[in-house]
From Swiss-Prot:
Keywords: Chloroplast, Membrane, NAD, NADP, Plastid, Plastoquinone, Quinone, Thylakoid, Translocase, Transmembrane, Transmembrane helix. It comes from the Eukaryota. PROSITE patterns: COMPLEX1_ND1_1, COMPLEX1_ND1_2. Its EC number is 7.1.1.-. This is NAD(P)H-quinone oxidoreductase subunit 1, chloroplastic. NDH is composed of at least 16 different subunits, 5 of which are encoded in the nucleus. Belongs to the complex I subunit 1 family. It comes from Nandina domestica (Heavenly bamboo). GO terms for biological process: aerobic respiration; photosynthesis, light reaction. It is an enzyme of class 7 (translocase).
Amino acid sequence: MIIDTTKVQQAINSFSRSESLKEVYGLIWLLVPIFTPLLGIIIGVLVIVWLERQISAGVQQRIGPEYAGPLGILQALADGTKLLFKEDLLPSRGDILLFSLGPSIAVISILLSYSVIPFGYHLVLADLSIGVFLWIAISSIAPIGLLMSGYGSNNKYSFLGGLRAAAQSISYEIPLTPCVLSISLLSNSSSTVDIVEAQSKYGFWGWNLWRQPIGFMVFLISSLAECERLPFDLPEAEEELVAGYQTEYSGIKFGLFYVASYLNLLVSSLFVTVLYLGGWNLSIPYIFIFIPELFRINEVCGIFGMTIGIFITLAKAYLFLFISITTRWTLPRMRMDQLLNLGWKFLLPISLGNLLLTTSFQLLSL
């Protein structure tokens, strides 16, 4: 039997011109901007886990992971695969609906925060005029998932851990908000893209780090507390609460809490970069003027400039990650009363005073 290649080619061409194939292409190009950042975020979390293991090994003067891949870089992937195949146990007298929804709410609410983060020039999922406040609103949902997990477990340790997570989030979300308000006042915008571009004019000296040093320190401490990292990991203190709200969990649901923790750490690092460290911009004054010109030359130059922006953003974010990981293995855990006193009696008055000073200077400069 001889195949007529001409007819086959005609059939392929007619299929490629069909409306159904155009709809498939449209759907693919619609999903690409969504799944590309998602893949990047997952890779970023894997790198954070590897970095934490290596840094903790160095601090404790021991050898870190070295068997799963070169230099142990696949260790996090191996741990996730192990948890994926473990049995998913459910508490016999717990609320199964709340128990199952808790980890999902914690992860999804943090993933939504990435939609307003500019990774580079023209590289943001949603450039909203209320970008930073949307992040604050969305990040307030995650403790609800932790509280649901603790309550649905029907375990006293889990419930206490959920209550601690909610109390800690409220205590440090409030001082963090005036710091963001101060940055919005300086930039005359609440858009994350506008905030980055407002820091671009004078290069390194235009960063909000130098104009808001007090706000930067308050934001840094509040971000660590929001991520529940040592010395602020009271909701899952092993010596007091076994594992806190995670006590009754196993399998992939248990792994989701760790994913949420590292996702939150990465998003906090990126917001420190965007708000205080100039985002995707280099430390060269007026360099931002030439970035749009790269896109006008040709697409290759534009993609090259965008890649450099992504690299700069991640380099600054991983600097904050290094500080937070080192802090975890350096400082001891605080008591619950010390944690609340630090948030309500120390950080909140300082952040409000910083906001008052910023508002006064902005009014005087009009």
